[in-house]
Amino acid sequence: MEIYTIEDIQTDADKFKKFIEYLNKYKGSSLDNLYKKVREKVPELNKYKEDDLKTCNTDKGKEGKYIEYCIFGNKPNSISAPDCPELNIEIKVTKFKTLKNGSYNAKERLTISNVGSTNNYETFRDLKDNENIENTKFFKKMEKILLIVLNKENNTFLGGVFINYNELESSLKTQIIDDYNDIRNKIDTKSVSQKGQKYLHIHPHGTKKEDGIRAVGFKNPFITEIFAKQMNYEIIKKGRSCYFNIPKKKTNYY
């Protein structure tokens, strides 16, 4: 097995891709087992343990912080740059829920970045001034995303996919652009809401509703669809619902 360093997986695009392929060999693993396998591939990470990070039980993003630290060697920070700056890649962790029929879909939206407050529409200046989404400040947080997906029910690893905006199917990219234009129009009319947006939407963010903070994020159906496509799972759409099944592993009998 080829051994990597933290620098390898954070700065070398080819090794980063191969590292994600390595992670996906352990779909269905507990996080503890995944960390163990990661440390075999990147021995330098043996000194990066969950106990190093102090988080409270109510911290909604604690799994994300643990994963980013134990798998990529990144400590939590408030820096606006992508998590892997050399590769311009943002690391996101989300959870998928199991439906009654045994299928899966995204439990919640994937927040990208705060963009302003409805208490002061001038705070949306970045969006108002940029007709092209690629020129916005938040675009660097969505251009390239490594999405790590966990099972909500048992916290096992469902897989990791790399989302490159520039390589999306034209239909997906067109819808995102349409959504962005809708968001800008609502800002212009001071009527911000997420109504009518399909993949990218503007939504309330933060604990204090009175602050009027809004963020942009990818909606559940987009996250579900992009993950399933990259994992080669069949996508099922019924009305507004989007979900997929994970094929059962074949058992060999001798």
Predicted stretch roles:
Residues 89:
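Conserved active-site neighborhood of enzyme catalytic/cofactor-binding cores
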Residues 1-84, 93-254:
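Nucleic-acid endonuclease domains
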